[in-house]
Amino acid sequence: MHAWPASEVPVLPGKGRDLRIHDTATDGLITLDPGPVARIYVCGITPYDATHMGHAATYNAFDLVQRVWLDTKRQVHYVQNVTDVDDPLLERAARDDIDWVALAEKETALFREDMTALRMLPPRHYIGAVEAIPGIVPLVERLLASGAAYELEGDVYFSVEADPDFGKVSRLDAATMRLLSAERGGDPDRAGKKNPLDPMLWMAAREGEPSWDGGSLGRGRPGWHIECVAIALDHLGMGFDVQGGGSDLAFPHHEMGASHAQALTGEFPMAKAYVHAGMVALHGEKMSKSKGNLVFVSALRRDGVDPAAIRLALLAHHYRADWEWTDQVLQDAVDRLGRWRAAVSRPDGPPAEALVEEIREALAHDLDAPAALAAVDRWAALQEERGGTDEGAPGVVSRAVDALLGVAL
């Protein structure tokens, strides 16, 4: 599976700061020092509907992570998956009387278009769950052989009790885990499981649903969590720098993934930092495909909204914050974009070197994009009020905003 084209990232003079970022597992800021190649895995979409603002906010957060690392002159090895076979996808395809493969391909193509328009840097490896199945099957077989997994009526489940570190990623109590498991794709009430929280590793073939050869497992398809583990271990190995996604992935997805990896390798954690973006709401409720309360990136683009304004609307909120999408949020972003473009369109302006350092410092401190935007606002206001004589300043600002914030002026 291919990703989307990359936009060129300007190289800024000097060197950026090392990233200090909030780690869910420790509930605190940690400083990441990846070495010459930073490794990041971000959980991708289930392609049964278009990219909404909640998706965009999540991928914007981890695009900033990449940009901070690139500014420190590191290479970035970024991997993202696509859950291109899953119950919601199959259910939507059946509802709309469309082939599930065609639906997945259509929505994945639209996602690529949205990411390109928003100038999100693409992953080096963009891997679908289906294409990863040949690598998933041996992992499930290993877990069975080690006793970390068991069979139940043809299905294979992971035993959370096989992981002595289970629970350390999300830091939730058992009752909350059980509640969230039921809400987020688990089956805690299924009879015969050793522990209600045990997640499925391999689903035996169901009539009328797609299935693949699972070797000794029989025909079926993989569970959600083992898909990401297989892809991450194959392309990044253990101990990569960041595993990212929305805050609703901390449990069960990232918790279970860490447990699978621990049982397979004997190492913990799978990622040095578990980083989670906040939720975006509309009319008081979290944007959700199941609820249908969505604002789509593609719809805004069709309505003529500049993608740079959409990106600024996302950047106006700290990545970990929960916030609400409103018409005013978008209008504020449109107005800000206009002010910034007017400011950099002049032939000269106030000195900008200090501004570049302010943006760098803001982003290095847990991706504080609102602080970075405020710094650019101050420079733009100064430009409007009294201008300046530095002939290179507007270009410096334009390149810094492009390189660090992903906004083309």
From Swiss-Prot:
- InterPro entries the UniProt entry points to: Cys-tRNA/MSH_ligase, Mycothiol_ligase_MshC, Rossmann-like_a/b/a_fold, tRNA-synt_1_cat_dom
Binding of L-cysteinyl-5'-AMP, residues: C43, G44, I45, T46, T58, N81, V82, T83, W224, G246, S247, D248, V280
Pfam families for this protein: tRNA-synt_1e
GO molecular function, a single term: cysteine-tRNA ligase activity
Where, if anywhere, are coiled coils annotated?
Answer: none
Gene Ontology cellular component list: cytosol
Which positions are annotated as binding Zn(2+)?
C43, C228, H253
Top enzyme class, one word, equals: ligase
* Subunit details: Monomer.
> What is this protein identified as?
L-cysteine:1D-myo-inositol 2-amino-2-deoxy-alpha-D-glucopyranoside ligase
User: What is the species of this protein?
Assistant: Streptomyces scabiei (strain 87.22)
Q: Which gene encodes it?
A: mshC
